[in-house]
Amino acid sequence: MNLTRNGKRIAALLFFLVVAGAVYFWEEEHARLLYAAITPFPEGDYWETLVNALLRDVVLLIVGGLLFLRRKRIPDRLQRYFPAVVLGILYLGFAWYMCGKLALDSYFLTTLAILAGLMNNIFPAILAAVWYHRNPSRGNKLLYFAVYFVCALLMLMDMVYFWQTTMHVQAVFFRNFNIYAIEGVMSSFSRNQLMEIGGFVLGVILLFRVTKPRRHKPNAAWALLAVLGWTLCCNLLYYTGSQVGLYALHESGLWSEEQIEKSRQEYRDMLATPIAGNIISKALFNKEKVVMATQHKKKELTDKDREWMYKLGVMRKAAPHPLPVPAYDRIVMLILESVHRDYIHCYNSEIPAEATPFLDSLIKQYPRIDNYYSSAVPTTEGLNATFRSQLLFDGDVDGNDKPSLFRSMQEHGFDGYFQSASSRYYNNEFRQYMEQFGMAHYEAREDLEKAGYSGASGWGFHNDEMYRRTLEQLKKLKGQKYFYVTKTLDMHQPYPYYATKWEETPESFRNNQIVTVHGMYWVDCTLRNFFKAAEEAGLMDDRTLYIITSDHNPHSGGEYTQLVKKEQDRLSVAPIPLIFVSKNTAPLENLDNSTYASQIDIAPTLLCLQGIKPPERFIGRNLLQQYREKESALGFFGDKAYYFSRDMHFVDKIDEPYPQHEYEDALANFVMYTYYVSGLPAGEVK
């Protein structure tokens, strides 16, 4: 008996040694071939890759060995915990997609991240299963199903969000969550994709299978301890391994690989994220505000921070130089909804030329900025950047004494008007906008309806009615000094619930299934009609400037990723149009069309154009002025700062404890410092 048992042990040991040897030689050959073409041969990178691969194989062998030792129990556990198995398979499929999308390696730390993520995402379902099998009842079965179904639906929602944004669900999703937002997301799917989603939901329901209650009940305490222990072990191994890996790379002198590894680590963390927990926390808490609050203690930038900000062109040593006299008496800003720069044919050949002929003609004829980026998303944050030259918006901070483009213009004799297509109650706009941005006159959907206008659906009034109202108001104000802003909505998903008739659509894209193209054709037509009517009404003259721009770039939608081909321009902060239209463009002759700029730059530019000194709290630059520092564009979304210039671009996580570069740490400090200063009462600003 002992001889037989010893023989089995020896056989198992020999089998393990053979497998281990085969794995080593296979991985060694693979690692050597990976660097064979490089001269001189990079020994450090070779060993780093080989050790990484072997550690991954060890982890997989351990997991496989544990499953083998418990192989007799596997059929029973598969039946008893089948819904959790379904969730696990869904997660593994999602993890595989994330790895491909984020270009993650398949080595040791990625494997640990997937194991941690697997346990994090099936943990609630396993607990519900243990509870049900311990106390079988109809109510507990319903609870089991609810936990399973909610986890599956949240995972589906996160998959869709990641597909559109390459991020897990963010808090901003819930700040704009309503029936129209849901319709907007759904409108971005084709019929086949909607059927696939419906099939997914139906499959999730049908795959909920539980065995009949058994006489032998699971030991709830032991089951909880085992599941919790394994989950904690996987997470501890992953996060410890991440830090040890960075330390090892640093000590071994592999500096470049260390910097790359820091970026990979952020992406790997997404694999380990408990999806349901993330979505629930983002729905209940605004992490961005938590990050901001923790940084309030930092009230000054260090000399090193300032040095980097000057090098990056984020800060400038020269003060803005306003013109000696106002260039215009009237400025009209037409703000489009969610329009990317590359939704215009002139910038993107994927858009048919017949879809945006008027916008193309304006771009060729008038001054514009070709590399003009959103500074924030969504609408309120984008308008905050436009009107207050700030990256971060906090509606809970009193804004009555805060500087803005409207307030500065109104203090110098210009009347301020803001016309919104949406309801005044949406996102508390009526209170927020007048308090934070300071326009003297605010008009929203309800006001237009009282004035007898019709033509609203979905989010609000359509472009044609908005422009008709604008023209009528401008006629009443003819000869006066004003700053008039019209904020449209028609490119907000779902669209087109408005549009030209099929027979009036150009044949070249009449049958085009990409609705964004049809939406942009409608935008183009309504703008053409607006400017034609303005010309006929005598509203186009040497003392009037019209500006066409967008509130922010589109942040989601399958068509967005289809139409915009350049990866850099599909980030959460991306280029939007900025066009200046006037019969007198001489004051704009110093504008460089190719410069890099963002929404925080438009307010100081317009004030300087009007001979008004911008408030010191404005962080943008005057685009009509030449600075010694380089030009740059700056944005913020989802606790990340986005930087763009002619020679570099990067994304900086604000609360990153170990930034890759000094300039990233400096930019994070700048963002939080300017947020702190922007919230100070007027008397406390130095």
How would you describe each model-predicted region?
Residues L3-K8, E27, L301, P659-A666, ...:
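Intrinsic-disorder-associated interaction segments
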Residues F82-I114, S188, T211-K212, I279-A283, ...:
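Short secondary-structure boundary segments
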Residues N235-Y328:
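Membrane-interface segments at or immediately adjacent to transmembrane helices
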Residues M309-K686:
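Solvent-exposed soluble domains appended to multi-pass membrane proteins
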